[in-house]
C-alpha cells in the first residue's frame, strides 16, 4: 500500500493513497545536533506529525498533505524530551498551496508554504536552508531526516531526528512499481532511495527536506508501506520546479500560479 507519511490516527481526510506524513527515517542514524538547524517539527494536539524546512526567518516549506488545524511549529528542536535553550515556537499566519489543500489527486504538487506569525532569529540551533540554484542530477547522494518511524514494521519513534543518505534515482523507478495509480510519464517529483532497500523515510517524516548539494531539493511526500522495501523508493516534491511560485508568494504575489 502506498503511504502518505503522516500519522494515521491524525488523518481526517479520506485519502486514496497513503502519504509519508509521520514517517521516521529507516536505516539511518541519529542526526548530529548541529546539522539540522533548518529542520522544523509540526505538532497538533501535542503530537509530532510532520517535518518541514525553514527557508528564511519567516517561511517554512512542507508538504500540502501536512495541512491540519491548530498546527504548532517548533524550531531549533533536537530532543522531543529535553528542549534546547534556543527552541522557538510559532503558529501559521498564512498557508499557501499549489492545489486546494484538500486535493491530493495530483501527485506532483504536494507542497505548502507556511508564513510564521512572527520571524525567528538565527541561533545555535536555528538557521534557514538554501533553496536550490539548479536541479539535482540523477545519481546525486542526498540526505533526508526526521522524527518519523525508525522501523518498517513497528510503531517505533525516536526522541531525536534520524538522518540517512539515499540516492537520487530516475523518476521511472518510482512510477514503475505502482501501475495501479497510473502516475504520469513525467512529473515534478523526485525519486530517491536505495534500490536494495533498508534506507528510507517513513511515517512521520512527511514534509521534511531532501538535501542534495547542501540545498533544499525535495519535500518528503509519499512511499510504500512497509517502508524501505527493495525496489520501492519514495517520492519527494521537486522544489526547483516550484521555485518561481515560492519566490513569488514570499514576495507578496499571493496570486502566483503554480507550474503546469
Swiss-Prot record:
Q: Which GO terms describe its biological process?
A: proteolysis
Q: Which InterPro entries match?
A: Peptidase_S1_PA, Peptidase_S1_PA_chymotrypsin, Peptidase_S1A, Trypsin_dom, TRYPSIN_HIS, TRYPSIN_SER
Q: What is its EC number?
A: 3.4.21.-
User: Top enzyme class of this protein?
Assistant: hydrolase
Tissues in which the UniProt entry reports expression: Expressed by the venom gland.
The catalytic site is made up of 65 (charge relay system), 110 (charge relay system), 206 (charge relay system)
Q: Tell me the leader sequence span.
A: 1-18
Provide this UniProt record's keywords sorted from A to Z: Disulfide bond, Glycoprotein, Hemostasis impairing toxin, Hydrolase, Protease, Secreted, Serine protease, Signal, Toxin, Zymogen
Residues carrying a glycan: 103
Q: Which cysteines are joined by disulfide bonds?
A: 31-163, 50-66, 98-258, 142-212, 174-191, 202-227
Propeptide residues are 19-24
Domain annotation Peptidase S1: ranges: 25-251
The protein's location, in the record's own words, is:
Secreted
Which GO-annotated molecular functions does the record name? Answer: serine-type endopeptidase activity; toxin activity
Tell me, in a sentence or two, what this protein's role is. Snake venom serine protease that may act in the hemostasis system of the prey.
> How is this protein organized at the quaternary level?
Monomer.
Q: Per the similarity annotation, which family is this?
A: Belongs to the peptidase S1 family. Snake venom subfamily.
What is the name of this protein? Snake venom serine protease pallabin
